[in-house]
Amino acid sequence: MLELNFSLVKNYLRLSADISLKSERIYAVVGPSGAGKSTFLNILSGFTEISNGSIVWNKREISGLPPSKRNISILFQDNNLFPHLTVWRNLALAVTQRPKISNDDRSQLRSAMSEVGILGLENRKPSQLSGGQQSRAALARVLLQKNTILLLDEPFAALGPSLKDQMLELIKKIAKNRKLLVLMVTHDPADAKKIASHTIVVKENTVHVPIDTKEALEPTKGPLADYLGNN
């Protein structure tokens, strides 16, 4: 269980939350542009400090911990792959800072690459990969961190419909197999409906209590009716 009870008041940033999120569930995070969706993920991951309140994961307070200690991984839209490194070296950064990779590390790397479907591409650099392959490589690196909370900040927005659907299905499969809690920011209601049973609406400086995705994205009377009606 991830329990959030916090407020953020810093310069132009305003955001508050009082919600609980169940483990082993995928949540979509939706709302108008500028509502605070990415800020919400940055707060959870530790890149933005809250003004007051708490963030509790499985009865452990984590709001005072650095990002590396929170059991949370985040995947961004730009993938953050180092262009001068091969896929193998990009992924290795998730498990070791040593130049020499141990046999155990090699096994972990191969397992992650197999899980996301890029085994055999380890010697390529990011520029030699398709957009879908880059997304899979970035996902593999995140999975190697072995955290149980996965945050997705529109990582597949630049992909075409077919590739994006493949990545969403892959996320669903991995989340189930690894028993992950997933929060995915998206501007596309169709993506939310495909992957998430529940949706968190971020609106008017508030992270609202999760509700059924179909209810949240009802275009005529849901909480985002005005927003969805203009898209």
Show the residue positions of the predicted features.
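ABC ATPase NBD coupling module
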Residues: 61-78, 97, 220
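Short coil-to-helix segment of the ABC ATPase nucleotide-binding domain corresponding to the Q-loop/switch region
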Residues: 85-94
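Conserved ABC ATPase "signature" region
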Residues: 103-121, 172-173
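Conserved ABC ATPase signature
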Residues: 125-129, 133
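A short, proline-enriched helix->beta-strand linker immediately N-terminal to the Walker B motif
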Residues: 144-148
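Catalytic Walker B motif of ABC-type/P-loop ATPase nucleotide-binding domains
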Residues: 150-154
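Conserved beta-strand-loop-alpha-helix hinge in the C-terminal portion
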Residues: 206-229
